[in-house]
């Protein structure tokens, strides 16, 4: 599971590189024009994905383990 912050303008670029299991969750942040993006990502892909997410505009990236995933 990966969570990150970004500007609204970066959302499409992030979605283009994010191999999410379904659509990501996008939440507004306190600062105008800023969002949080949360997505379930295969654990085998996450570490190779991080540089691309940074290049797409993601900041404050958190990677969390998933105990169980119910499809």
Give residue ranges: language-model regions:
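Small-molecule-sensing regulatory modules
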Residues: 1-71
């Amino acid at each position: 599971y990966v969570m990150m912050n970004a500007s609204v303008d970066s959302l499409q670029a992030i979605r283009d590189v994010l191999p999410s299991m379904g659509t990501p969750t996008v939440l507004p942040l306190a600062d105008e024009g800023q969002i949080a993006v949360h997505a379930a990502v295969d654990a085998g892909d996450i570490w190779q994905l991080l540089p691309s997410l940074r290049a797409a505009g993601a900041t404050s990236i958190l990677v969390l383990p998933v105990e169980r995933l119910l499809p």
